[in-house]
Amino acid sequence: VLCYHKVERRQELGVTRISPKRFAKQIERLARAGWRALSLSEVIACASGQRTAAPNELAITFDDGYRGLREHAFPVLEAHGFRATCFVITDFAGKLNRWDVAYGGRRFAHLAWRDMRAWQGRGIEFASHTATHPRLTRISELGVHEELDRSRRAMTEALGVGTMAVSYPFGAAGPREERLAREAGYAAGFGIARGWSRSVMSIARTPVYLWAPLTPAVGVLRAPEQLAALVANRCAIGTT
């Protein structure tokens, strides 16, 4: 399961941005190699043991839901017949990313609800990245419940469908957060840079950052890549 963040022309000091040209080349190489991108329900079925992923199957996800995806990522995926899941911060739909540290003073806009509705049914699914992007492990149980529940309700109201999954901000989640996500009505939870998935509420993903090769690593991260991803995550201050 691959995890992207920004696909933008504008540069910044952070590491989560991939240029549109580089993203297009990565997807083109995956398509040429015969990879097939799974839907969210198929990923959940694999993680829960209901199906086995074929050797040429992967999943593509995006965290944060930046507006640049509608111009630079979604059309590329559609052209190659690839599906993807975009995890959105619901309180910031259509707004600037003021929840995040502005490295170099640059702000990036998030997808608006109308953007998401325009891509529904075209291979792009939308799921929760909480309401405001806090590090869930550092807030109260009541706070975690509010973040998860408010986000799920906002998506149902704006998109007309419920969301099956949540991506934990910063990949930070333990047994408490996984339990609360399940209690809030989520069927799956996604982490980051964890190697093997522990359960359907803790699905591991391979982060694709600035330094990623043109052919992204698929499967369990190699030790150096996992260390780099963990360091990047630890250094991500965001709202905490």
Spans of model-derived segments:
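C-terminal active-site subregion of NodB/CE4 polysaccharide deacetylases
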Residues: 1-61, 67-68, 138-240
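Surface-exposed cleft-lining segments at the edges of enzyme active sites
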Residues: 96-107, 133-141
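Histidine-centered catalytic micro-motifs
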Residues: 2-4, 125-133
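Short beta-strand and adjacent tight-turn residues that come in two discontinuous sequence segments
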Residues: 87, 129, 189-191
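Generic enzyme active-site microenvironment
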Residues: 61-62, 127
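A short, conserved beta-to-alpha structural element at the edge of catalytic cores
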Residues: 81-103
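Acidic (Asp/Glu)-rich catalytic clusters
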Residues: 31, 75-82, 109-128, 182
